[in-house]
């Protein structure tokens, strides 16, 4: 049954420009956005969930077609992206979006072989691709500056001495940026070293670290609660929900920094969150594409408000001034780090 559903989805993506009779008269059926998501699935607060929301809203508002693809494996998703990006669909303006950096390596190889189409009718947009190519468009959402601010504020907290960063896999650019930014910011206000735990070192699958909420809840959070760590920073996708669940059930044992969205509503032990507004970012990309001004490489950073550090309500009076005082230095450090 799953195989049949996959075939139907892929068929819709490949031939959707011919499906005109089902669309209302005001609908621009010759313009479509196809987004290939990671096989991890989506929820409202996940990066994929935000992108799905943004794409749904902007395509509805512009009355253009939106075709999401949910592969069962990364291999299947990468093959779908390569096939779509390698076919110029005449008579249909098409934007193909790779929503997950896990596809970057495969797409880089595909581009280097000259197998990606870049025409007025077909363009490929990669989110956080770790390479540049004339036939590929990249939207980069940098983590360094906002994580630098988070590290600086964490180091100023009197009850925070030992911090651990949980990362899913340091092969991902934004994860490396977030890790390094936090460590650099923390070292500015406190001399203690920051511990880093990489989930990819215990998994055969490089993507498993994004989906270990049960391990986080049943094992890793208990380790933190023993007093080894006062604060954790989980840059590991869905895995963060295991830590937040433990925080809710055992308040006051350690702080968890929210990542991706404002997560203060899930636990009082979230002092601040590193937020990326991916719904707005992907909408901006679609509008640029529709207006024929899509940039080959665009950065959606802290200064423009595409990402930000959001302080939880009960900590605002204490931490907002810290966030403001370190803002300029964080952005300058990010510029230097990126070079």
What are these regions (language model features)?
Residues 27-29, 33-54, 58, 67-78, ...:
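Extracytoplasmic "Venus flytrap"
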Residues 139-161, 275-294:
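Hydrophobic alpha-helical segments within soluble ligand-binding/sensing domains
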Residues 284-339:
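Hinge/cleft segment of the Venus flytrap/periplasmic-binding protein
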Residues 90-101, 125-127, 226-237, 257-259:
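Periplasmic-binding protein-like
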Residues 55, 148-193, 297-318:
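An alpha-beta-alpha
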Residues 13-16:
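C-terminal motif of bacterial Sec signal peptides marking the signal peptidase cleavage site
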Residues 18-20:
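Bacterial signal peptide processing site
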Residues 117-141, 261-269:
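Flexible loop/hinge segments that line or gate small-molecule binding clefts
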């Amino acid at each position: 049954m799953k195989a049949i559903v996959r075939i139907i989805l892929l068929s819709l993506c490949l031939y959707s420009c011919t499906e005109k009779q089902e669309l209302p008269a005001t609908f621009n059926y010759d313009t479509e956005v196809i987004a290939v998501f990671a096989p991890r699935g989506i929820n409202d607060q996940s990066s994929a969930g935000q992108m799905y929301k943004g794409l749904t809203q902007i395509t509805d508002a512009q009355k253009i077609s939106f075709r999401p693809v949910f592969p069962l494996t990364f291999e299947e998703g990468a093959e779908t992206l390569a096939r779509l990006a390698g076919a110029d669909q005449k008579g249909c303006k098409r934007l193909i979006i790779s929503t997950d950096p896990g596809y970057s390596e495969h797409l880089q190889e595909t581009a280097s072989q000259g197998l990606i189409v870049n025409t007025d009718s077909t363009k490929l947009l990669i989110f956080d691709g770790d390479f540049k190519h004339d036939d590929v468009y990249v939207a980069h959402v940098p983590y360094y500056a906002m994580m630098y601010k988070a590290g600086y504020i964490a180091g100023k907290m009197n009850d925070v001495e030992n911090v651990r960063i949980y990362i899913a896999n340091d092969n991902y650019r934004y994860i490396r940026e977030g890790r390094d930014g936090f460590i650099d910011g923390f070292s500015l206000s406190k001399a203690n070293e920051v511990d880093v735990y990489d989930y990819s070192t215990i998994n055969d699958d490089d993507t498993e670290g994004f989906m270990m909420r049960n391990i986080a809840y049943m094992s890793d959070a208990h380790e933190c609660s023993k007093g080894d760590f006062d604060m954790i920073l989980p840059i590991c996708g869905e895995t963060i929900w295991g830590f937040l669940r433990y925080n809710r059930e055992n308040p006051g044992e350690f702080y968890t920094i929210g990542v991706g969205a404002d997560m203060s509503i899930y636990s009082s032990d979230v002092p601040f969150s590193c937020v990326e507004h991916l719904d707005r970012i992907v909408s901006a990309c679609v509008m640029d594409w529709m207006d024929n001004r899509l940039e080959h490489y665009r950065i959606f950073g802290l200064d423009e408000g595409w990402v930000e550090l959001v302080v939880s309500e009960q900590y605002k009076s204490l931490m907002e001034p810290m966030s403001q005082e370190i803002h300029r230095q964080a952005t300058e450090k990010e510029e230097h780090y990126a070079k």
